[in-house]
Amino acid sequence: MASTFIPGLNPQNPHYIPGYTGHCPLLRFSMGQTYGQMTGQLLRGSPGLAWPPAHRTLLPPIQPPRSPEPRRRSLPVRPGHERLSSSMVPGYTGFVPQAQFIFAKNCSQVWAEALNGFTQRNGGQGSQELPKEAKGEKDVEKDQEPKPEVEKEPELGQEAEQASPYSMDDRDPRKFFMSGFTGYVPRARFLFGSSFPVLSNQALQEFGEMKSPGRSQKDPKHLPALSRTYPQHLGLLPKYGGYVPGYKFQFGRTYGHLTQDALGLSTLQKQLLV
């Protein structure tokens, strides 16, 4: 019976001393006794939930279903797995398989037990296998050259579906981006006053004309005039919460006159009036 107890505990009176920070299952549901008496009572019982996971099995081992599988060949060991077999010091932050299911032990014991269990379950380091059909056959004769595969030409319909609005012709009605597009649209930052599809179409056409000046000279396309956000001949109503360029430099008149002066006159006209 003494061999069934956890290593490091007294077989005659097994218990945890107060200050033990490990996990003791069922302790939170027990009361009325001291910490040592309660843990001793739980540990002296039959191997169950009170025992650490290393000395009990909650579920039977799960076996994979037997199915006809192709013959497999072992792959060579990858160099990255050698770090798990080396002596790891406390503070190692890498991943150790199955280490999160072991408690009440120091780092070295947890890692050693986790690696041993993982190696046994997977049949050693050479357990990595590859199906036979997935591995290329190396019995091809050297004189026999593989025939070049004929590349299938993509259909015109597929090319049209995969075409980007950047490369479409200016007359293509699909040369625009849908609302919500977060990519970069050249020249779009200088346009406003319309929906995003219309703005993106105008921006792409303008960018295409700037990129190919010879084409724009042969077939010039005049873009429509941009609509203005502010009226130039009328002032704005009081309590307008938007930004009015040049308004903060105006003073001495009503809000309507000041906004009219700021928006309706050019910089040269303002300098002449002063």
From Swiss-Prot:
Source organism (scientific name): Bos taurus
Major site of localization recorded for this protein: cytoplasm
Signal peptide: none
Function: Microtubule inner protein (MIP) part of the dynein-decorated doublet microtubules (DMTs) in cilia axoneme, which is required for motile cilia beating.
GO cellular component terms, A-Z: axonemal microtubule; motile cilium
Complex and partners: Microtubule inner protein component of sperm flagellar doublet microtubules.
InterPro entries xref list: CMI2A-C-like_dom
Region (Disordered): 46-89, 119-171
Domain of life where this protein originates: Eukaryota
Coiled coil stretches, renumbered: none
Tissue distribution of the protein: Expressed in trachea multiciliated cells.
Family, per entry: Belongs to the CIMIP2 family.
Compositionally biased intervals (Basic and acidic residues): 130-155
Subcellular location: Cytoplasm, Cytoskeleton, Cilium axoneme; Cytoplasm, Cytoskeleton, Flagellum axoneme
UniProt entry keywords in alphabetical sequence: Cell projection, Cilium, Cytoplasm, Cytoskeleton, Flagellum
Name the record gives this protein: Ciliary microtubule inner protein 2B
